[in-house]
Amino acid sequence: TRFDNFYSGSLPCMPARRELHTGKYNFLYRGWGPLEPFDRSVFEVLRQNGVYSHLCTDHSHYWEDGGATYHNRYDTWEGFRGQEGDRYVAHDIRAEIPPRASALNKAGISVEQHYRNRTRQRTEDEMSGTRTVRAGLEFLAEHADRDNWFLQIECFDPHEPFYVPQNYRALYGLPEQETLNWP
């Protein structure tokens, strides 16, 4: 089954996920937060009806206070670390943090964490988004001949910080140094 006629009422982060899980509009009723105990997730309904569900994601908010209880509604899940301010790389690892090129760019601990996380994601193959999609493709290959399953490949990007590796920046003549990446 292909879902190609779905419209979200809440575009930001966790409110949009709650809509995907419950089919209920979240906007104007509730802010950023977890699924509630009374929420009925589509993935639990799928399980009750014999459909196996799997999540591949690099969305670290699933493991934070206020964002939890989504990923455990799937039968199984894989999470890939290192997006945004994900507390992945230890604080004592030095990272080169460029000067703030725009007053619109965010500053502070989550930016510092982002640059520390990049020390583990130097190549495209190491990027959490690449690893997320690769895991989803592996799942598809392993389950292509099977029936009654649902796969969700959920990439955090596009999401601030808008980090673009230099080889892609060069394709469009963009400056080597990042300018506005975290408004």
Protein language model annotation of sequence segments:
Residues T1-P183:
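Catalytic domains that recognize anionic headgroups
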